[in-house]
C-alpha cells in the first residue's frame, strides 16, 4: 500500500509518520494492511496543495492508495487577517486533493475541526456528525468549505473533525501553558469555552484504523470527556509540576484584553458517535491521554526514547 501524508511536518503529520514507521502507537498496533506501506511524506515547499497543477501531477505520478491531508492554516487569529492564505490552505487545497484522488481512485482522509460549529446552541449536548455547522470565524468558515469540496469531488473520502489538538511535536496549547507558567507564574484562562482536548496519538491511531476501510463519510474524533480551557490549563499545570497558578476568566474579559482575537465557539464539544459505531473508538479519556503525554514528553526534544 502507498500512502501520501501532506502537512507531514505538523503535529498530526509527524505522529502519523511515527506510527507508520513503528507499526504501532501508545494505544495499540496499526492495521496489518499498513505494515511495510510505502509512505511519501510531503509539505511546503515540496508540495503546495493550493496549486492545482502541482497536486494533479504529483498524485498522478505517485498514484497512492491513500492520501492523508494534515495540511492546514490553523492560526485562528491569523485567518481573520490573512483571508486568502486561509482559503488556499483550508479550502482550495482540499478541493485540489479531492479532485486528484477521485481521478486516481485514491482514498482521501481530510482533517477538519470543531470550529465549523457556532457553539451558541449548547444545552450541554455534544455535537455529533448530524449537527448542522455554523462557523463564527474565518478559520471555521474556510475549514467548512474544505469539507464541502471534499464531499463534492471525492467519493472515497473520510472527513475527520477533531478539536484542541496537542502532541509531542510542534506548537500547541499544552506547551504554551507550560512555558507561560514557568515565565509568569500566574495565568488567566477562559472558563466558558468547552470542548475535547485531543492527543495527536489518539487521532493518528484512529485515522489509520479508518483509512483501510470502505466506511467513507464524516467522523468526529476527539478525546473522551469535556472540559473548559481553564480546566485543561489547570490539569496541564498540575501534571507538569510547574510552580504556577491558573485563574478563570470569561471570554468577554479575554476579548477586552485581546480585541483582535477571533471569536471562538463557547460549546464545541464533539460526540464520536460514527467512530464508535463503525471501526470502534479506542480514543482515551482526555485526562488519561494528557497524563500519558507528560510521562513521555521530553520538552523541546519531543518524545523520550
Identify the function of each model-found stretch.
Residues 1-26:
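N-terminal Rossmann NAD(P)H-binding glycine-rich loop of SDR-like oxidoreductase domains
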Residues 38-53:
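Rossmann-fold cofactor-recognition segment
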Residues 49-89, 100:
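NAD(P)H-binding glycine-rich loop region in Rossmannoid oxidoreductase-like domains
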Residues 88, 92-96, 103, 107, ...:
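Catalytic helix-loop patch of NAD(P)-dependent Rossmann-fold dehydrogenases
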Residues 148-195, 200-202, 208:
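NAD(P)-dependent short-chain dehydrogenase/reductase
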Residues 189-194, 219-226, 278:
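Glycine-rich Rossmann NAD(P)(H)-binding loop
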Residues 206, 213-260, 301-303:
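Mid/C-terminal beta-alpha module of Rossmann-like enzyme folds, strongest
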Residues 285-305:
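Amphipathic terminal alpha-helices
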Amino acid at each position: 500500500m502507498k500512502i501520501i501524508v501532506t502537512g507531514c511536518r505538523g503535529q498530526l503529520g509527524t505522529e502519523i509518520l511515527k506510527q507508520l514507521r513503528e507499526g504501532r502507537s501508545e494505544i495499540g498496533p496499526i492495521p496489518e494492511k499498513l505494515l511495510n506501506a510505502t509512505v511519501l511524506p510531503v509539505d511546503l515547499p515540496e508540495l503546495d496543495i493550493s496549486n492545482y497543477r502541482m497536486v494533479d501531477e504529483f498524485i498522478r505520478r505517485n498514484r497512492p492508495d491513500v492520501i492523508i491531508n494534515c495540511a492546514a492554516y490553523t492560526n485562528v487569529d491569523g485567518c481573520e487577517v490573512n483571508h486568502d492564505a486561509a482559503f488556499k490552505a483550508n479550502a482550495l487545497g482540499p478541493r485540489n486533493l479531492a479532485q486528484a484522488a477521485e481521478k486516481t481512485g485514491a482514498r482521501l482522509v481530510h482533517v477538519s475541526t470543531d470550529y465549523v460549529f457556532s457553539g451558541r446552541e449548547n444545552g450541554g449536548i455534544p455535537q455529533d456528525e448530524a449537527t448542522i455547522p455554523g462557523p463564527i470565524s474565518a478559520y471555521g468558515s474556510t475549514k467548512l468549505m474544505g469539507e464541502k469540496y471534499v464531499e463534492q469531488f471525492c467519493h472515497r473520502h473520510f472527513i475527520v473533525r477533531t478539536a484542541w489538538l496537542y502532541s509531542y511535536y510542534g506548537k500547541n496549547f499544552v506547551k504554551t501553558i507550560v512555558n507561560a507558567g514557568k515565565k509568569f507564574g500566574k495565568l488567566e484562562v477562559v472558563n466558558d469555552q468547552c470542548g475535547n482536548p485531543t492527543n495527536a496519538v489518539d487521532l493518528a491511531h484512529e485515522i489509520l484504523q479508518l483509512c483501510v476501510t470502505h466506511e467513507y463519510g464524516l467522523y468526529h474524533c476527539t478525546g473522551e470527556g469535556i472540559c473548559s480551557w481553564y480546566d485543561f490549563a489547570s490539569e496541564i499545570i498540575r501534571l507538569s509540576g510547574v510552580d504556577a497558578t491558573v485563574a478563570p476568566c470569561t471570554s468577554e474579559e479575554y476579548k477586552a484584553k485581546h480585541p483582535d482575537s477571533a471569536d471562538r465557539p463557547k460549546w464545541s464539544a464533539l460526540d464520536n458517535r460514527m467512530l464508535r459505531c463503525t471501526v470502534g473508538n479506542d480514543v482515551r479519556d482526555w485526562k488519561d491521554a494528557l497524563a500519558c503525554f507528560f510521562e513521555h514528553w521530553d520538552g523541546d526534544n519531543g518524545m523520550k526514547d
